């Protein structure tokens, strides 16, 4: 009987710790602390970018990099470097995320629809130069591919962004 109680306490402790880690990851995501830099030209319809994410836990930072990459393409864009031209954000309204919160909260939730548009290109391994200690946190750099054409089409279909040709009247 005593062993059953001990086992129950251990299982409960593990569950509480895993829930806490998930809440921590969500809190870091809501702050949207990341940097994006272009790496090279991806295949047609995609961006190949390096995303720098911040977290106290390296595994959390690596997982959040995918979410941050899609968020950056939609809301921030990136400056040009390494022979890659600058890309503006897909969203033209700076307040779109707050205006359409009911759409974007589930979109960026853990395991949300953002996963459809992003993939890590280097099997998820983090190089020594891409793992930096900044105070009590890690700054983790991962190279990801974002399927921009698919993302744009789905956001247009959902009415979140205007189609590319929407500003021009037909003749």
Cite the ranges covered by each PLM segment:
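Bacterial N-terminal signal peptides that target proteins for export
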Residues: 1-8
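Domain-level marker for long, solvent-exposed, non-transmembrane regions
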Residues: 19-171
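Bacterial N-terminal signal peptides
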Residues: 8-15
């Amino acid at each position: 009987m005593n062993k059953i109680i001990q086992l129950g306490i251990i299982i409960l402790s593990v569950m509480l710790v895993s829930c806490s880690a998930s809440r921590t990851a969500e809190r870091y995501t809501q702050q949207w602390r990341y940097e994006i830099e272009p790496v090279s030209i991806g295949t047609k319809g995609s961006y190949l970018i390096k995303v720098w994410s911040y977290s106290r836990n390296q595994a959390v930072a690596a997982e959040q990099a995918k979410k941050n990459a899609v968020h950056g393409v939609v809301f921030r864009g990136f400056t040009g470097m390494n022979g890659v031209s600058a890309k503006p954000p897909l969203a033209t309204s700076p307040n779109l995320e707050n205006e359409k919160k009911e759409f974007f909260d589930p979109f960026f939730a853990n395991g949300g629809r953002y996963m459809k548009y992003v993939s890590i290109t280097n099997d998820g391994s983090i190089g020594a130069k891409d793992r930096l200690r900044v105070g009590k946190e890690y700054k983790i750099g991962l190279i990801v591919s974002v399927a921009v054409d698919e993302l744009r089409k789905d956001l247009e279909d959902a009415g979140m962004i205007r189609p590319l040709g929407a500003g021009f009247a037909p003749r």
